[in-house]
Amino acid sequence: MNIHEYQAKEILRKYGIPTSTGLVVTKTEQINETIDKLNTEVYVVKAQIHAGGRGKAGGVKVVKSKEEAKKIAHDMFGINLVTHQTGPQGQKVKRLYIESGCDILKEYYFSIVFDRSASCITFIASTAGGVDIEEVAKKTPEKIVKFSVDPATGLQDFHMRGIAYELGFKDNQVKQMKEIVKSVYNAFIETDATQIEINPLIVKTDGDLLALDAKITFDENALFKHPNVTAMRDYDEEDPLETRAANAGLSYVKMDGNIGCMVNGAGLAMATMDIIKLYGALPANFLDVGGGADCERIKEAFKIILSDKKVQGVLVNIFGGIMRCDIISEGIIAAAKEIDIKVPLVVRLAGTNVEKGKKILSNSGLEIITAHDLADAANKIVEAIS
């Protein structure tokens, strides 16, 4: 789960990490009053969306007067901001964060993430801050340093010292950086985050360190432990179909293709998407109905898939283990009758009660194309929509 920058900074401040000060705006009528409350010479108006690249897209503006700040805030609120992470459709700006500007001596990058390949927690730091870290990794990888932390032993003093020295800090800045590293680590562990990113972490002209921007992502499986974090969720920033699917116990991710996929199991779902592309088409979604799906969940899955107007055909690929093929077939038929599916539907079944499931489909009287294996299914759905 992602949260907004102003929420991330609120969490960091609770852990003693210095951040820039500001106020959030959720309605246009709050803009003038909010800006009047800020006692500063420089105003920074920031669009709050769950995507990076805001600055390059015009979602971050720096001005030196109240009137300019008010005009820019009014102009920015409600626009559709398109960045390299939002896709061409963009994201509507429904919140602004207006904060005090500050003089910057140097910018750094600092983050903590789960390194799944190494099964450990990893700090990532760079002297090239304020820019896309992926670009730094591609063009100047030598500017990035990593420190891995064994979960069994936890954060040690040598980790904190090492990060501070690698970034070139000296004297009091080393002490400040060690405190930031420790606080970020504690926040990461205690909130069940999967990423905390400060970009940029700056050195001000007075030599002090400050988190100028912040991003935090949380493990959704641990949200039940953190009602205060869950309360920060902004459903306006999430795909409504993905939210609807989650509420139905389905794992759904919308994509850009035209063939809807309904599969049980994440691995099989990814294999299904791969083979659709292999046969010359593109998947419209990732949808895992899970191992315990019933007729109602199957119907809801179809409704979600077909609510995407780009879908020209649907491929159902089920391996019956815990979930029996006859139950799946009954759910498919019930959904087809209720929804009136008007696009080609290809079904491939294997596993528990597969023959029973195929018989139910063949006796249904519906226009359902059956396939005997995955390659046959992909070939048939691609042919059907061509």
From Swiss-Prot:
Instruction: State which Enzyme Commission number(s) the record gives.
Output: 6.2.1.5
Which residues are substrate-binding? N264, G321, I322, M323
Please list the residue ranges annotated as the ATP-grasp domain.
9-244
GO molecular-function term, one example from the UniProt record:
ATP binding
Keyword entries, A-Z: ATP-binding, Ligase, Magnesium, Metal-binding, Nucleotide-binding, Tricarboxylic acid cycle
Per its UniProt record, the required cofactor names are: Mg(2+)
Q: Give the stretches traversing the membrane.
A: none
Matches recorded under InterPro entries = ATP-grasp, ATP-grasp_succ-CoA_synth-type, ATP_grasp_subdomain_1, Succ-CoA_synthase_bsu_CS, SUCC_ACL_C, Succ_CoA_ligase-like_bsu, Succinyl-CoA_synth-like
* Catalyzed reaction equations: succinate + ATP + CoA = succinyl-CoA + ADP + phosphate; GTP + succinate + CoA = succinyl-CoA + GDP + phosphate
Please name the Pfam families in this protein's record. Answer: ATP-grasp_2, Ligase_CoA
What does the entry list as the binding residues for Mg(2+)? Answer: N199, D213
* GO CC aspect terms: cytosol; succinate-CoA ligase complex
The entry's free-text remark on the cofactor is: Binds 1 Mg(2+) ion per subunit.
Q: Which residues bind ATP?
A: K46, G53, R54, G55, E99, C102, E107
Q: Which GO terms describe its biological process?
A: succinyl-CoA metabolic process; tricarboxylic acid cycle
Which pathway is it part of? Carbohydrate metabolism; tricarboxylic acid cycle; succinate from succinyl-CoA (ligase route): step 1/1
Tell me the domain of life: Bacteria
Role of this protein: Succinyl-CoA synthetase functions in the citric acid cycle (TCA), coupling the hydrolysis of succinyl-CoA to the synthesis of either ATP or GTP and thus represents the only step of substrate-level phosphorylation in the TCA. The beta subunit provides nucleotide specificity of the enzyme and binds the substrate succinate, while the binding sites for coenzyme A and phosphate are found in the alpha subunit.
How this chain assembles, per its entry, is: Heterotetramer of two alpha and two beta subunits.
The family annotation for this protein states: Belongs to the succinate/malate CoA ligase beta subunit family.
NCBIfam families for this protein: PRK00696.1, sucCoAbeta
The molecule here is called Succinate--CoA ligase [ADP-forming] subunit beta
Q: Which gene encodes it?
A: sucC
